[in-house]
Amino acid sequence: MTEESTKENLGAPKSPTPVTMEKNPKREVVVTTGPLVSEVQLMAATGGAELSCYRCIIPFAVVVFITGIVVTAVAYSFNSHGSIISIFGLVLLSSGLFLLASSALCWKVRQRNKKVKRRESQTALVVNQRCLFA
């Protein structure tokens, strides 16, 4: 199998490789090329995990949320309203809530898409079954 047919099978991009130019201390221009990665190659490398970001966000969001609770509690236990630590705690708290909410939203959208795909495939099966028995 040739290299070109392998690239076509993996979905390699058709455009030329990107080129970056840098100047080194001797005032010479160094040209560095880097490969482009297509979505197919990314899915092959990650095993399709790029579509499950909501599962990765949840643990990080929980840690940030708990840290925000602790920092805010410590700040307000010393009556330091408006200090840097209380603002930092509130920022962590709100960031954790935002990450949890976005993760829940992504999960709901993903579930809805799965339901639509199931319904479409079931409709196709019923139509095929009717054609067979008609």
Swiss-Prot record:
In-chain residues carrying the UniProt-annotated modification Phosphoserine: S15, S121
Protein name as annotated: Transmembrane protein 100
Transmembrane segments: 56-76, 84-104
Disulfide cysteine pairs (residue numbers): none
Description of the deletion phenotype: Mice die at a mid- or late-gestational period. Show embryonic lethality due to impaired differentiation of arterial endothelium and defects of vascular morphogenesis. Conditional knockout in endothelial cells show similar vascular defects to those observed in global null mice. Conditional knockout mice lacking Tmem100 in dorsal root ganglia (DRG) primary sensory neurons, exhibit normal mechanical sensitivity but reduced acute nocifensive behaviors induced by mustard oil, consistent with a reduction in inflammatory mechanical hyperalgesia and TRPA1- but not TRPV1-mediated pain.
Lipid bilayer topology: Multi-pass membrane protein
Keyword Methyltransferase belongs to the record: no
Keyword Zinc-finger: no
Pfam families linked: TMEM100
Annotated InterPro entries: TMEM100
One GO-annotated biological process of the protein: regulation of sensory perception of pain
Residue span of region Disordered: 1-23
